[in-house]
């Protein structure tokens, strides 16, 4: 699918039918999503594919979001690794046979002290922007497979790790509902491009 067409076909779909989504198709979409760029190529994301615990995840959500989570075939909970120094060293460890020596040194020695100097706000902003980039890649990848999705920001992040049994070092960022739908969405209004461009 051409990129313009792909973007025009991507919509926030909020109702889903009963047609099953093949897990392998979702896994492929996530694999494609991880080709997204990330600052320092740190890839801080963690995808938790939720099916059995959807009902628990839906508790306490605003009604519209609750219905989506219950109807979706899967919910992808996107987390970010808050221990960036550890993440950096993990990339070096796993990639040791593929990465040149200078990059191994970069991940093992250069980046960890840089991340250690981040304050809480800097870490939060760093993680949020990387999460947004990979989430957009995921919904476009799903759209390319004709699978519907929606990004949910309105959920109780304080309970998500406990429900899904995820190490608290991983910060919940957003939920993505995944399924097939009978919705026939209309294109959302977009501001004219000249309203969002300035030249200097």
Curated annotation (Swiss-Prot):
Note whether Glycoprotein occurs among the keywords: no
Q: What class of enzyme is it?
A: oxidoreductase
Coiled-coil ranges (or none): none
Which InterPro entries has this protein been placed in?
A: Nitroreductase (IPR029479), Nitroreductase-like (IPR000415)
Q: Indicate the secretion signal residues.
A: none
Single GO molecular function:
oxidoreductase activity
Give the EC number(s) under which this enzyme is classified.
Answer: 1.-.-.-
Domain of life, per UniProt, equals Bacteria
User: What cofactors does this protein use?
Assistant: FMN
Which residue ranges traverse the bilayer?
none
A Pfam family name for this chain?
Answer: Nitroreductase
- Give the family per the record: Belongs to the nitroreductase family.
Q: What is this protein called?
A: Putative NAD(P)H nitroreductase Spy0809
Organism listed in the record:
Streptococcus pyogenes serotype M6 (strain ATCC BAA-946 / MGAS10394)
């Amino acid at each position: 699918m051409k990129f313009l067409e792909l973007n025009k076909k991507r919509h926030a779909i909020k109702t889903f039918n009963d047609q099953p989504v093949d897990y392998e198709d979702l896994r492929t979409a996530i694999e494609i999503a991880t080709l997204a760029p990330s600052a320092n190529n740190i890839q801080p994301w963690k995808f938790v594919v939720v099916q059995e615990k959807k009902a628990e995840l839906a508790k306490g959500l605003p009604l519209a979001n609750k219905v989506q989570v219950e109807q979706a075939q899967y919910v992808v909970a996107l987390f970010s690794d808050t221990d960036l120094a550890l993440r950096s060293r993990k990339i070096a460890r796993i990639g040791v046979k593929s990465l040149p020596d200078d990059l191994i040194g970069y991940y093992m020695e250069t980046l960890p002290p840089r991340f250690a100097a981040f304050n809480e706000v800097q870490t939060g902003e760093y993680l949020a922007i990387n999460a947004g980039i990979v989430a957009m890649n995921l919904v476009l990848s799903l759209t390319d497979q004709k699978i519907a999705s929606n990004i949910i920001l309105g959920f109780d992040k304080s309970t998500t790790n406990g429900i899904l049994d995820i190490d608290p070092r991983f910060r919940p960022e957003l939920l993505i509902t995944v399924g097939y739908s009978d919705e026939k969405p209309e294109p959302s209004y977009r501001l004219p491009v000249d309203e969002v461009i300035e030249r200097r």
